[in-house]
Amino acid sequence: CCNWPCSFGCIPCCY
């Protein structure tokens, strides 16, 4: 999913 802060350009599955 998201490796770094979802604020960049990854899938916001950190929430």
From Swiss-Prot:
Localization annotation: Secreted
Write out the PTM section of this UniProt entry. Both Pro-5 and Pro-12 are not hydroxylated, and Tyr-15 is not amidated.
**Which residues form each disulfide bond in the chain?**
C1-C14, C2-C10, C6-C13
Q: Which UniProt keywords apply?
A: Disulfide bond, Ion channel impairing toxin, Neurotoxin, Secreted, Toxin
Q: Name one GO cellular component term.
A: extracellular region
Q: Which family does it belong to?
A: Belongs to the conotoxin M superfamily.
Query: Domain text from the record?
Result: The cysteine framework is III (CC-C-C-CC).
Tell me, what does this protein do in biology?
Probable neurotoxin with unknown target. Possibly targets ion channels. In vivo, intraperitoneal injection into fish provokes paralysis after 5 minutes.
Q: What else is known?
A: Authors confirmed the assignment of this toxin to the M superfamily by cDNA sequencing.
Q: What is this protein called?
A: Conotoxin pr3a
| Source species of the chain | Conus parius
